[in-house]
A protein has these predicted regions:
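Cysteine-centered catalytic environments shared across enzyme families
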Residues: 1-201
Length: 201
């Protein structure tokens, strides 16, 4: 086991997990949204990782032999040496589909790590990204639905949603929900009430 210095730090969990398993086994064990960077002192390399669905972002760029990264593009752009040139291809995607597909962003030379990927950056500047999770059927344990009837599928989705909501309700701060007026957010609130055993405010 590990002796924690804090009483509830996600960051400390990452540090101990990295120390015990390395980055690839660590991300396999994480359940939820995350984006993190870890400097491996022994291996002399930087690791970046982004959650399976890509809820938490992580952006990066290279300039003059330096590798820069941040959770927001505006943090990278605080360096006046970073070019501010619009990526017209990404802009076209954004205006057409309201999204810029990873790894591109609206700025040339600034990229986002794709969802479900880790990236290893060595001291000589070489960066290698690789996928650690895939939602494509046949490559995900959740995709095995052949031969299941409708009731089994509905119950399975309900149980997965309920378990996911229950995990996300573990918090030391108040929890809130944005209601869009659609079915999905209303269903989430109903399941939250069920899990909490009380009405959700």
């Amino acid at each position: 086991g590990y002796q924690f210095r804090t009483d509830h730090s996600d960051t400390e969990v990452l540090v101990h997990g990295f120390s015990a398993w390395g980055v690839e086994k660590l991300v396999d064990r994480l359940d939820g949204m995350f984006a993190f960077a870890i400097w491996d002192v022994c291996g002399q390399r930087l690791w970046l990782a982004r959650d399976r669905i890509g809820i938490k972002p992580i952006y990066f760029t290279r300039l003059g032999g330096a590798f820069r990264f941040a959770s927001e593009i505006k943090a990278i752009l605080t360096d006046p040496k970073i070019p501010r040139v619009v990526n017209t291809h990404a802009l076209s995607h954004y205006l057409s589909f309201m999204v810029t597909p990873a790894p591109v962003t609206l700025f040339q030379g600034i990229y986002k790590l794709p969802a479900g990927h880790i990236m290893e950056i060595t001291p000589d500047g070489n960066a290698r990204a690789r996928r650690f999770w895939n939602a494509i059927p046949g490559q995900s344990s959740l995709a095995d639905v052949k031969g299941a009837n409708q009731e089994t599928l509905v119950n399975g989705v309900r149980e997965h949603l309920k378990a996911a909501i229950e995990k996300r309700m573990i918090s030391d701060v108040p929890i809130g929900v944005f209601l869009s007026g659609g079915i999905d957010s209303s269903a989430n609130v109903a399941l939250m009430s069920e899990v909490a055993n009380r009405p959700v405010e």
